[in-house]
Amino acid sequence: MTAKALRQPAPLRILSNTFLAFWCLIAAFPIFWITVMSFKSPVDAFDSNPLNVIFGPATRADGSGWSVVDIVLGLAVVYFTARLSARHLPRLVERYSPKGWTVLGWIVAALLVGVGFVVVFFGALPVVTGVLNPLLGPLGRDVIGATTEHYQTVWVDRGFSNNFKNSLIVTAGVVTVSLTVGTLAGYGLARSGSTLAFWILIIALIFRSLPHSVLVAGYLPVFINSAEWLSPILGENAPTLYGKPAAVIAVLVAINQPFTIWMLRSFFSNIPADLDEAARVDGCSHFKAFRLVIMPVMWPGVITTGLFSFLLAYNDFLVTSLLLDASNQTMVPAIAGMFNRETTTTDQVVAVAAAVSITAPLFLLVMVFQRQIVSGLTAGAVKG
């Protein structure tokens, strides 16, 4: 079928493009609005006039604002960070990662990009604009009121960095365990034609459909009494798992593991079994063939599955709020705790700044892995 035959009529193209543009605006508006609010004083952030929220006259009157130079250079830093990461990062990771450690290479690369962006955007950029603004006259005058004091409050004064660290621990643990078990189980089930493999998949699907609260209730007595149960083995040093990140990792892995097994099994099913046989002929064991031949082909699927596992652990509220104490709380329950009847408008803007902060790693993750995610979803959707 030719390209001309596949081309949509002009009215239909206009209608579909208009609808997609409108839907994108509707979907992106909440993120855009809370981002704008997080840089304003409480007076501007909760003003009934949308223009005052955007331009922040009260914030600018307090001596906090951005000039045209600030805005242009800030957008340039964001644009070039995204563009250079998407274009060069996959090639650099592939070149410099040790053989068999590509995932670790991606994690290190993502951390380096994130740290570098924070250093440039919040460290070097204010110094540069502070020198340029007095020299450029009208272009150096504040045109939009903006302040970063709410981010300083939430990360420095409120100790949100500790919540961020706990989220990283939980997320890294869930993703690591889920992918390790999921790849092995998915590969075995994809290569097995027995009836037992079918029933294992059905049982996994049943466990996946259970409400999260049911699993939490089942694990709760184990975690609370863990010190008593482990004391015959570990003696007086037996730990209480309740309130610790390890408890949350165990529950979230139990919730997420059926999904990862199902998804990875579908990816492995699309890889011809001839690759396994060829590797076996060349002298590889089953595990060596899996590690050196199958897994390099599977990386897009593994990264896609890992992204969904990351989102489950990173955004979880129910399990983390029930099983973690205040000192080990992750970011999502910590933000929810900032909203209560006693909060002031300043506290609410601080909570908004915290909410914006937790979305930044998600954008960075999708930006860095966009090609692998699209490739993995395409591979999982097409058989053969």
Outline where the language-model segments fall.
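Transmembrane alpha-helical segments of multi-pass membrane proteins
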Residues: 97-119, 207-208
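Short, Lys/Arg-enriched, disordered terminal segments
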Residues: 1-7
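Membrane-interfacial, low-structure loops and terminal tails that flank and connect transmembrane helices
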Residues: 1, 90-103
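A structural signal for multi-pass alpha-helical bundles of membrane permease subunits
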Residues: 6, 12-91, 114-384
